Swiss-Prot record:
Keyword Repeat in annotation: yes
Annotated segments matching region Sufficient for heterodimer formation with BMAL1, E-box binding and for the effect of NADPH: 1-61
Protein name, as recorded: Neuronal PAS domain-containing protein 2
Composition bias, Basic and acidic residues: 1-10, 378-390
Source organism phylogeny: Eukaryota, Metazoa, Chordata, Craniata, Vertebrata
Ranges of biased composition (kind: Polar residues): 421-431, 587-610, 645-664, 694-704, 766-789
Effect of residue 471 to L: Susceptibility to seasonal affective disorder (SAD) and diurnal preference
Alphabetical list of SMART domains matching this protein: HLH (SM00353), PAC (SM00086), PAS (SM00091)
Subunit structure: Component of the circadian clock oscillator which includes the CRY proteins, CLOCK or NPAS2, BMAL1 or BMAL2, CSNK1D and/or CSNK1E, TIMELESS and the PER proteins. Efficient DNA binding requires dimerization with another bHLH protein. Forms a heterodimer with BMAL1 and this heterodimerization is required for E-box-dependent transactivation. Interacts with NCOA3, KAT2B, CREBBP and EP300.
GO biological process: central nervous system development; circadian regulation of gene expression; DNA damage response; positive regulation of behavioral fear response; positive regulation of DNA repair; positive regulation of DNA-templated transcription; regulation of transcription by RNA polymerase II; response to redox state
């Protein structure tokens, strides 16, 4: 009994422990089963254990590969992940990663291609690498990519795992906002090797599907790819920031009306890198891209006109020397008291490159072209009109621009963009402007003859001004026609379209040259005519002044030889500046001819009169010389000066003079000539414009000097008790000999025939129309020093002659106003 009870107790405890163990094992199996993927049905314990074992084996293999490929911690910063470190390395090396199949299809490209070449990754994916290369390099690059297939049809794992890198150089096409621009290539370097990958998606519609034959291709599922790092041969110092997704980042700033920074938001430093104190006081145009300055200037003008607006997308230079795309909403704030514009408030938003490209192409009225048209080497046009900022950069590639094949050219973005700066130069040649012009200019070129009028002979009064040189914008609009390049797949059709464009430009240039040559010939003929008229006027002036001494000798036999010599010197001094002067205006020529004719006619008339009219002739000739020497470019109305000298001399006066003085003595003529030879100095030409129009009427008034002038004693004057001596005043406006001061000198010897009141002598000089505002200068005529004992003439008391002013030189008028004073 006791043994049986002991056995039952042991059996019960053993069963209890086994049950506990089985329950614990079932819990673990159930937990493993829940952790396995794809648990759609209930699995037994054996299946669960098999799957767990398989997962552990895979995990061990992956861990081993990760340890091999993982970057060692000794040279990689611990706070950077592998992806971040790879991106930083690519940016520092000016490179990107690309994966290309053996037939040239691009299956992967990193995002760093955008700041380097301007392509979006989505545009490059599933395209063929040969589409981005010049035609001269297609065969060479294709041989490099298919080189491993020539060695063996099925690459061995040892060949694929070899560390021998493959390096080669080529040119890669640059991306641009405008696909119509002439293609530009960048010189790059490929460094990489071949790797095998499974389940690589086959590209579709890349244009090179039939390049390789089916037997030469690697079987599906065992694709071999060329993985390489692409670097620029010429490093870029200014790169475009790669922002593919819209980050919705913005910041505010405040500017003056001249667009200088006055305030910067705290959100700006993480975006542009500048602290507020680094940009305050600087102009916003210092941070903008050179290609966006013209568009931003237009936006600034629009803002100043309307007070608010939105700018276009533009590039802003960050502190890290990268271009970031921004778009600004701005408005002008006004002072609350005087309502004057105070400053400009701007809200800047970050824009992605993809959005900018879509917006620019919409502005250009272009549809998003397919891959063949986007990366084609030929210029293709959809027939839409191009805006002025579209340029044909044909001159940048030289003579190879006419060829459809793309010649390799190592040009960076900075050198490529600097070629557009010639548009802002006003002195650019038409050849350079041809590359920068806008195409819609045929209507302006058709009206070219109307825009260049040739002045006729009716405008001979004024010299024809030289033709104004047209600005760069007008010249380019006249030169370039509106040419539409039809998109043709054949290279010869593309060549013919380009050739027709250059032929049209050549015809426009030849037409412009013919018009300019005709204008030059017309101007030369007009200049020749003016020179002939100048020679005629100068010859007449020489004859006039050579005849003047002979006229004076015919009436004054007592004139001394030294007076004749002084008169000849004076005439030579007047003639020499006129002969040495430059070309004059036609208005001056005509006035000088009329002046010389009137002077010759007056001298011939005066030669038939008595001694007293001789003095009037000398007075008129002196004033005529002064009037002719004061001819200025401002007016041609001085031709009316000599005919307006109305001198009235009665016959009775000349008879009295002949009876009372049988042997006349005209020694006082010399003193009168000396006084009249003083220069009449008007104001400088610059002061003519400074006068108000209301002062013009005052210049013609008569100015009287009541105390400072001496009395002019006329030999034929009536007695002092019933007459007054006339007072001569010579003005630039009007000069009138009028009786205004009584004479107290007795004249008992005056004959009775001369007691009649002689008519007053009026010397009237009309002021020129263009010299109304000149200063009126008066000549103070001293009294005659009459010889004592002369019959019939009163003897005035000896008066001290007024000192003569030294002649002054007026640079703005003729040099004849500065004649030397003859010796006393």
């Amino acid at each position: 009994m006791d043994e049986d009870e002991k056995d039952r107790a042991k059996r019960a405890s053993r069963n209890k422990s086994e049950k506990k163990r089985r329950d614990q094992f079932n819990v673990l199996i159930k937990e493993l089963s829940s952790m396995l993927p794809g648990n759609t049905r209930k699995m037994d314990k054996t299946t669960v254990l098999e799957k767990v074992i398989g997962f552990l084996q895979k995990h061990n293999e992956v861990s081993a590969q990760t340890e091999i490929c993982d970057i060692q911690q000794d040279w990689k910063p611990s706070f950077l992940s592998n992806e971040e470190f790879t991106q930083l390395m690519l940016e520092a090396l000016d490179g990107f990663i690309i994966a290309v199949t053996t037939d040239g299809s691009i299956i992967y490209v990193s995002d760093s291609i955008t700041p380097l070449l301007g392509h979006l990754p989505s545009d490059v994916m599933d395209q063929n690498l040969l589409n981005f290369l010049p035609e001269q390099e297609h065969s060479e690059v294709y041989k490099i990519l298919s080189s491993h297939m020539l060695v063996t049809d099925s690459p061995s794992p040892e060949y694929l795992k070899s560390d021998s890198d493959l390096e080669f150089y080529c040119h890669l096409l640059r991306g641009s906002l405008n696909p119509k621009e002439f293609p530009t290539y960048e010189y790059i370097k490929f460094v990489g090797n071949f790797r095998s990958y499974n389940n690589v998606p086959s590209p579709s519609c890349n244009g090179f599907d039939n390049t390789l034959s089916r037997p030469c291709r690697v079987p599906l599922g065992k694709e071999v790819c060329f993985i390489a790092t692409v670097r620029l041969a010429t490093p870029q110092f200014l790169k475009e920031m790669c922002i593919v997704d819209e980050p919705l980042e913005e910041f505010t700033s405040r500017h003056s009306l001249e667009w200088k920074f006055l305030f910067l938001d705290h959100r700006a430093p993480p975006i542009i890198g500048y602290l507020p104190f680094e940009v305050l006081g600087t102009s916003g145009y210092d941070y903008y891209h050179i290609d966006d300055l013209e568009l931003l200037a237009r936006c600034h003008q629009h803002l100043m006109q309307f007070g608010k607006g939105k700018s276009c997308c533009y590039r802003f230079l960050t502190k890290g020397q990268q271009w970031i795309w921004l778009q600004t909403h701005y408005y002008i704030t006004y002072h609350q008291w005087n309502s004057k514009p105070e400053f400009i408030v701007c809200t800047h938003s970050v824009v992605s490159y993809a959005d900018v490209r879509v917006e620019r192409r919409q502005e250009l009225a272009l549809e998003d072209p397919p891959s063949e048209a986007l990366h084609s080497s030929a210029l293709k046009d959809k027939g839409s009109s191009l805006e002025p900022r579209q340029h044909f950069n044909t001159l940048d590639v030289g003579a190879s621009g006419l060829n459809t094949s793309h010649s390799p050219s190592a040009s960076s973005r900075s050198s490529h963009k600097s070629s557009h700066t010639a548009m802002s130069e006003p002195t650019s040649t038409p050849t350079k402007l041809m590359a920068e012009a806008s195409t819609p200019a045929l209507p302006r070129s058709a009206t070219l003859p109307q825009e260049l009028p040739v002045p006729g002979l009716s405008q001979a009064a004024t010299m024809p001004a030289p033709l104004p040189s047209p600005s760069s914008c007008d010249l380019t609009q006249q030169l370039l026609p509106q040419t539409v390049l039809q998109s043709t797949p054949a290279p010869m059709a593309q060549f013919s379209a380009q050739f027709s464009m250059f032929q049209t430009i050549k015809d426009q240039l030849e037409q412009r040259t013919r018009i300019l040559q005709a204008n030059i010939r017309w101007q030369q003929e007009e200049l020749h005519k003016i020179q002939e008229q100048l020679c005629l006027v100068q010859d007449s002036n020489v004859q006039m002044f050579l005849q003047q001494p002979a006229v004076s000798l015919s009436f004054s036999s007592t004139q001394r030889p030294e007076a004749q010599q002084q008169l000849q010197q004076r005439s030579a001094a007047v003639t020499q500046p006129q002969l040495g002067a430059g070309p004059q205006l036609p208005g001056q020529i005509s006035s000088a001819q009329v002046t010389s004719q009137h002077l010759l006619r007056e001298s011939s008339v005066i030669s038939t009169q008595g001694p007293k009219p001789m003095r009037s002739s000398q007075l008129m000739q002196s004033s005529g010389r002064s009037g002719s020497s004061l001819v200025s470019p401002f007016s041609s109305a001085t031709a009316a000066l000599p005919p307006s000298l109305n001198l009235t001399t009665p016959a009775s006066t000349s008879q009295d003079a002949s009876q009372c003085q049988p042997s006349p003595d005209f020694s006082h003529d010399r003193q009168l000539r000396l006084l009249l030879s003083q220069p009449i100095q008007p104001m400088m030409p610059g002061s003519c414009d400074a006068r108000q129009p209301s002062e013009v009427s005052r210049t013609g008034r008569q100015v009287k000097y009541a105390q400072s002038q001496t009395v002019f004693q006329n030999p034929d004057a009536h007695p002092a008790n019933s007459s007054s001596a006339p007072m001569p005043v010579l003005l630039m406006g009007q000069a009138v000999l009028h009786p205004s001061f009584p004479a107290s000198q007795p004249s008992p010897l005056q004959p009775a025939q001369a007691r009649q009141q002689p008519p007053q002598h009026y010397l009237q000089v009309q002021a020129p129309t263009s010299l109304h505002s000149e200063q009126q200068d008066s000549l103070l005529l001293s009294t005659y020093s009459q010889q004592p004992g002369t019959l019939g003439y009163p003897q005035p008391p000896p008066a001290q002659p007024q000192p003569l002013r030294p002649p002054r030189r007026v640079s703005s008028l003729s040099e004849s106003s500065g004649l030397q004073q003859p010796p006393r």
